[in-house]
Amino acid sequence: MNDEGSTATGRRSPLAKVLSALPPGTQLVIGGTVLLGAASYAHLMAAGYSLSKPNMASVSLLWTILMSVGLGLFFPVEQELTRIVAARVVGGQGVAPVLRRTLVITATMLVVLTGGMAVAVRPLADTFFDGRTDMVLALAAAFVAMAAGNVTRGVLAGLGRFGAYGTQLAVDGALRIAIALGCALGHVRSPLVFALILTAAPLVAVLVTLRPLLSSVRPGPQVAWSALTSGLAPLVASTLLSQVVVNAAVVSTQLLAPDNAALVAGLLNAVVLARVPLFVFGSLQASLLAGLSSTAAAGDRAGFSKLLGRTCVVVTVLGLAGGIPATILGPWLIQVLFKADDVLGSLDFLWMSAGTLCYMLAMVLGQALLVLHRHRLQLLGWALGTVALIVTTLVPGPIATRVCLAYTLGSLTAVVCMFAAVRLTFLREPPAAQSGADQSARPSLVDTV
């Protein structure tokens, strides 16, 4: 019996070995991430079948701007908060001062962001939402909800409360699915209602997990403002630029062809479909980052290089597994799943799928640079990728082809730059020379949908 048990244990699949090595509750985080990712598809499918093309285009643009600007601004707050809280927990210090000052920083960011939107409400409404100022207000509310979720998840992850973290993701996803399907079955035709789902669901999820968060927050020594802000600026800039690269296609199309609502909506559907591999990769990213950080901290050059290479292989397989079916079936699938018009071809999906593969590779290499404390080199890679995207978008030609190809070339440029940066950094000094590299491993998981 014991021999058989040992044999069975030794023959576990690689995925089972990875899951067993994760901290308690992390599997719930993965489950919550999966549910939240599925919610994006359900939300957009319900909107696609319920709304007119112009109204669906407005929802598509709001979703894209939220995923670009919102994630770019507030996900870095979650990352830095997780890192600092986790360090305090290890040192036996309370995290209440960290939470208070992070709330001040986040509130300041929200005031600047929403204040700017209030000043420019009319131009924003005319440019993106067919003149509807209520959609601008819905976008501002969604920014507030996203910020609340990122701050609370940052603290929960740093405290090791992965069960509550996963619960927040799961509640958010379940509510988005339930409300969106309810709106579709109830024949709701208002884009505002579908937009407000992005505010209501995450706020309820935050309230559900507020009690375990507050019960774990203890008083402690004050934290310096510089400790919270020193790494935040380059991280925010890098994340914003990376979100520009991955989400620019929809906004670029709206700016280049404001009267083509069908193309705007169809491109969002294509982006969501082509990003399925990115969504899968995001649910496993934290464990991969932890491995890179531990090998770097131990000075294990061979282990660091081997793990980074294997991660790139896994990402490539994911990209091909999702990209080939998307290229072949994508034009048909977006019509069936999202009720999109016949506005995109297989070549467009080929570029989108290739862009997703390159984008995932850039994410892996960018995280390696963070582990090696090369934040500015990561920022440089995304900056050059954004330049390549803009240049390609402005080249004459069919709009759909330009914006899809721009995604590919922008991501490819970032990959090449970051590969060179990792290579040069790794040759100059071993990972062990990077003191505190293990702090770059963050227990919170990333939403790519």
Specify the residue positions occupied by each region the protein language model found.
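Hydrophobic alpha-helical transmembrane segments
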Residues: 133-137, 166-215, 384-388, 400-426
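Interhelical loop/hinge segments that connect adjacent transmembrane helices in multipass membrane
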Residues: 2-22, 163-166, 187, 191-197, ...
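Transmembrane helical elements of multi-pass membrane transporters/channels
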Residues: 25-41, 172, 176, 197-209, ...
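Helix-loop junctions and terminal segments of transmembrane helices
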Residues: 74-90, 270-273, 278-299, 370-371
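Signature of the first transmembrane helix
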Residues: 2-6, 20-78, 233-256, 448
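Membrane-water interface segments that mark the loop-to-transmembrane alpha-helix transition
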Residues: 24-36, 62, 74-122, 300-323
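Membrane-interface junctions at transmembrane-helix termini in multi-pass inner-membrane proteins
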Residues: 145-167, 350-381
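Interfacial segments at transmembrane-helix termini and the short loops linking adjacent helices
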Residues: 53, 121-139, 261-264, 327-357
